[in-house]
Structures are given as structure tokens and as C-alpha cells.
Amino acid sequence: VLLLSCLLLAACDLDGDFNNTKDYPLNPLTEIKANLAFSCVHETIPASPTDANTLFQYARWLQKNNQLKQDKSVDTEIERLYRIASENGNYKANINLQNGAMRGHFNVRGEEHLRMSQQLIDAGVATGYYFVGVFLKNGSAGLKQDTEMALRHYRKAADQGSAEAQYYVADKLGPKKIAPAVARQMRKCAAEQGHGRAAAMLSIYLRDEEKYNEAIEVLQMGVAAGESTSASRLSKGFLNPAPSNQSYYLGQQEDLERAARYEKIWRVLANYSYANPTVPDINEILPLPPAQLPPWDGKLQWLEAHLANVP
């Protein structure tokens, strides 16, 4: 009941007072379940001024090229560029700077995290609420650990379109005794925004319910998002495994060419997992049945751009 109450109340307006420790009354379980309704919203990020966007793109290029080397001096330059871009209205730079700091690549003080998160919130960027939820959950960025308030911020972020928050809240609501229908809606919403793990998780539930066509549609979203296991499962699913093979049976007829293409894509995604690959052209290469497969030269849009390595 406590968990559901927190996730419900997080959907209400939050005043941005990150130190709020007010006690909220708990509603009866039946009322909470009735009010957990979720409407899918995709996160929007305001356009950036041209100069700030140029800095962001260059910083992102440096970051991509430093993923394997992890040169600290390069991290310092990336941080500097992200800071300038962020302070000049580039919210993607704000997000990348905070994410990088939480992973130990950049140095961002607690009060800076809160100020930058508030900038996102003020701009209508749902990730701002998600970040505050992380800080409250972990007791970091100068905030006291507060599980209830963390959950409220996660739910607010999910309602406003944060795919990461939608995935996180869905995991909490997923069990049968809580709110699995809401969890499914959140996972689908996150998958539509390119959250590969949400797509993979949702496909498992659809497969178990023998909703195979829905499952492959969601797995296709997973492939587009760069989630390698989605490509692997589709590859094996089109080899027509026995229905008893619960891991890979997807109710599809054998199609060796489809299986081979998905396997090639899986290898690219697995080999370049460190670089966060995606397959935005998946529906051009592998439209789902009953569509016929078009000719394919074996190239992937993301891989070609990655190998070209143009800033």
C-alpha cells in the first residue's frame, strides 16, 4: 500500500522543494489502484540555440571517441563544453553532464545537480524530475534519503514522459498483486521512445500470453533502440523453434532470410554495445511479416555513421 501510495501521489504537482518531508495520508488500496491510471506522454526537449547545439555536438563526438580510451584529460574538456552548452540553453548537454557525473566521468557538485535539475523541470523536461528521484533514492546531491519522495518524483517524471522513469516505475508496479496493466502501458510508452530494456521486458509478458504478433512488434522496437537480445530473439524466432521452446518460440513461420538478417544486426549490436548503437532503419531493412523483404546491401545507418566518425 505504501509503495502504491507513493507512486500515485508522485503524479500530483510537486513544488520543486527538494527538502520537503511532509507526511501524506495513505489512501485505501482500492482507491489507489483506481487512480494509478497512466496516459502515455513522450518526453520533449526544447530546441537549443545554434551555437550551444554546435558545442553539444562536438562534446558528444569527443565523448563517443573516448568511450574505450577513457582519457581523463578528454573527460575534462568534454565536461567544459557540456557546461558551456548547458548554461546557454542546451538541455541535452545538461542531461549528459549530469549522467556523466553520476558515472564518475565529470565533477558536478550536489547543489549544481539540483540547480541543473531544476532548469530541466522549469523547461518541461521530464528527466529533471527523474534525476531528483535518483538523488532522493540514494541520498545524494545534498538531499536526505527519502524513498517516498523519490517514488513521487519518479512517478511525476514517468507521467511527463521520461522513458527511464517509465521503465523504473513499471518495474515496481509489474507484480500481479500491484498494477501490471499500468506497468505494461508504461513499458510500451518507454519502448516507443527508444528504451530497449522496456521493449525486451514487455515482449516477455506478451509472449507468455501467446500474443506473438504484438511481441514481435515490441521486439522490433527493441532492435530499433539497439537492444541486442531483441535482435537475437527475433533471429531465433524466425527459425521456427518448437512451441515448447519458451525462450524463442514466437508463433512465426520459418523464414531463413529474416533470421539471417536479424542475426547480422545482433552481431553489430553486441560488438558495439559500448557505443550505444541503434537501428533507426530497421523497418526498411526488415519490415515485419506479412511484408516482403526488400533488397539489403548489409549496411546499417548507425554503423556507417559511426565508422565515418564525423564530428
Residue ranges of each PLM-predicted region?
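Short helix-capping/linker turns of helical repeat alpha-solenoids
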Residues: 48-51, 55, 87-92, 104, ...
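Terminal, low-structured helical/coil segments at or just beyond the last alpha-helical repeat
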Residues: 243-311
